[in-house]
């Protein structure tokens, strides 16, 4: 800070005398302990960064947990989808298979559930009797097994027609035993052919 001071003497100046003013300059410097202050600020910054690092580590742990949970959920979902797809595939491969006896003819029907049930109802409405109806894996093999069992048990008294879709029993007295043979072949046969609904 600079200040100008008035002349020292108050006497009026004499003629010819040299008048001089003394100028005094005062500089004030405040010396602060900046070293300690900087250390405090640095410790605060370091502490804040450490807290931030801890927060980041907590967040990353939470994120890892969430990712693990999501992976578990995705695995479960994928296994459920795979199971449903496998079921759907087996259901598409399977067909309904029915055996009906009308008069002295054994009729076998295969196809969609609606078609088979409708055909069985038609035959039963005309005096037929339902012997078997279920979902099967291989209807052609079931027809072959029924044909073989009837041919073995009844011999020449059975006439197969339409690729083993119809079997005519010539002796009506053997119709009851033919019915039992069909039931035994289809119920007691290979259980892997039967598919649960």
Curated annotation (Swiss-Prot):
What this protein is reported to do is described as:
This protein is required for viral late gene expression.
What is this protein identified as?
A: Putative early 21.8 kDa protein
Give UniProt keywords alphabetically. Answer: Early protein
């Amino acid at each position: 800070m600079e200040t100008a001071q008035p002349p020292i003497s108050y006497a009026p100046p004499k003629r010819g005398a040299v008048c001089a003013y003394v100028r005094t300059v005062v500089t004030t410097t405040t010396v602060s302990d900046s070293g300690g202050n900087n250390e405090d600020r640095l410790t605060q910054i370091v502490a804040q960064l450490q807290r931030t690092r801890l927060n980041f580590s907590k967040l990353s742990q939470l994120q890892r947990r969430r990712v693990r949970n999501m992976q578990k959920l995705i695995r479960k979902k994928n296994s459920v989808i795979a199971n449903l797809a496998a079921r759907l595939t087996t259901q598409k491969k399977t067909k309904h298979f029915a055996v009906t006896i009308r008069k002295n003819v054994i009729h076998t029907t295969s196809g969609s559930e609606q078609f088979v049930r409708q055909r069985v109802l038609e035959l039963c409405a005309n005096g037929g009797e339902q012997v078997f109806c279920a979902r099967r894996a291989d209807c052609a093999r079931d027809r072959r097994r029924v044909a073989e069992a009837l041919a073995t048990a009844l011999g020449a008294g059975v006439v197969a027609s339409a690729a083993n879709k119809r079997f005519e029993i010539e002796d009506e007295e053997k119709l009851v035993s033919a019915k039992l043979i069909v039931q035994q072949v289809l119920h007691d046969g290979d259980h892997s052919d039967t598919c649960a609904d």
